[in-house]
Amino acid sequence: MIIYDKPFKTYEQQIELLRTRNLNISNQEFAIHALDTISYYDLINRYQKHFIPDGEHFIEGTTIEQLYSLSMFDRSIQAFILKYSMFIENIFKTKLAYTLSRDFGVDMSVYLAKSKYKESYQNPNNVLTFDAVQLECFKTRNDDKIANNPTLYYREHHNHIPPWILLKNLSFSNSINLFKLLKNAQRDDVVNELLPNEPDRIIPLNDKTNFIICALEAIRVFRNAAAHNLDFTALRTDETRKIPSSTLSKCLPGKILIKKEKKKIEKNEKVYLKGVYGVMLSMMVLLKTDYLKKQFIVDFLSVFNGIDEGDREIRPFLFQCYANIADMPVDTRNRFLIYLEQT
């Protein structure tokens, strides 16, 4: 007979276990509510880096109310990331669809013709082929379980499906893959539309292309983690897909959002850029206009507002915990406030 190492426990048993691990639980009813709505795993395991440094016992004085508040705070940041990831996805797909339509036309058999693309693209861990991506595009068009409005509507009521319609239903991942496989002329056009040079900022095309690919991939991965309730705070970009810090710094000049020492990006800053902070700064770059960047910052700062005075007072403490777990600068809020004042 198998003795399972993670057997089922009732909420009452979970509470007793947490008490033996030094978690302060004074309100049994609230504790059951917290475990019933958020779950033991999401409430405890997700934040143990900060609250359970030895892996066994909570820091003295830690309460279940603090964990619950931190979880809600975490979800506010995830909702913020979700909102802007969808915006970035739309910006990217709009640029991609425009280029495909202008250069190749609106007939799917033409703008998805193999001759228009590179045969393959070398990802860090595998080879991406055009045949595989083309197949995903056809699945989106043909399969009733995948095809939805507007693609399904166009399939049934029009004589073609233009790029701007297909891309509405093509996944973010497959849209990025299609972009990777574009020949240089079209890919360069999309890159320059997403990240145009400015009089005081000239970035080599290869560097811009690498940044766009890494930034879009990171935004997609963090968006998916938030959408599917995965361990968002533990997510980091690996070495093969990390957002290029030097290019990001050129796009956000000054020493406000990315700290430098003697014109070099500090070591801690590079750690921050592997997590959600790097994704946030990449989003700002892709938003392009000062208005959208300011709106982005205002929306982020709103997570500190709280529902009442007591909730607002605890927000700085919650963010300090969150920053420690997610590897964000503890002064993120101040950095954005200063950026707002100076732009």
Language model feature labels by segment:
Residues 2-342:
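Long, contiguous internal "core" modules enriched in hydrophobic/ aromatic residues
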